[in-house]
């Protein structure tokens, strides 16, 4: 009986240890902001496929992985720096560092190792232009945005949005060795898309941002000014999103998605501008926030679909 008890205790101990190890791995993975990594992979891939070049699939796969790891590393460093304010916001209080599941020094070391590793491997596997752009993206997000802009100016999202807009540029550089007009246009689309996307959320979460001391636009310029700027950015985004059609790397499918999506963004922005009180305001803002994600996804998916269809036709011919 004693032997059986000891065996059961040992099994329980091993299970507990395995569970703890699994939890720690998932916590470190959470530091990488996996949902952001998925978006980075997606937009970087589009930057690759719109390039007028023969793409080596192995180099492309390694490059996408390293771009994703680099983005995750910058997210990890962002969480390390922002642990104090994350603890004050409901949306972020359960992140691994403020919740006490990972020590700040562990997160810092993890982020630095991944940053250096991703840049070096991308440089060796692809080229040093792409590696340099990835390094710039990491530094811009982790240092310039996280450590300076985020707590210093209401334009934090506008300027800092450059980091989130760079993956298509890095992706194109990785497979071609240069930066072309295609990826620069994609950069511009994401850059202009970012403010209305995040400010819609900021209108709803303004109280939390104020409590954390983050100068988001609704807390600095006021909700009315923020709503007007959301409309103006949406007006600018609609025609900008159609530039790929004018340049010839966006076809009819992309044009349809661009027109309908642009009108949808504008309609959502006007709705946010009109509804200014209570639950209707919150629903309008969160509706625009959600639609903006769908809009960008469909826009870039249309480019992927058209490039895939073009490749299929070329092979079939």
Curated annotation (Swiss-Prot):
GO molecular function: protoheme IX farnesyltransferase activity
Gene3D superfamilies: UbiA prenyltransferase
Keyword Kinase in record: no
Name of the protein in question: Protoheme IX farnesyltransferase
Lineage: Bacteria, Pseudomonadati, Pseudomonadota, Alphaproteobacteria, Hyphomicrobiales
Pfam families, A to Z: UbiA (PF01040)
InterPro entries: Protohaem_IX_farnesylTrfase, UbiA_prenyltransferase, UbiA_prenylTrfase_CS, UbiA_sf
Organism this protein belongs to: Methylorubrum populi (strain ATCC BAA-705 / NCIMB 13946 / BJ001) (Methylobacterium populi)
This protein's GO CC annotations: plasma membrane
Membrane topology note: Multi-pass membrane protein
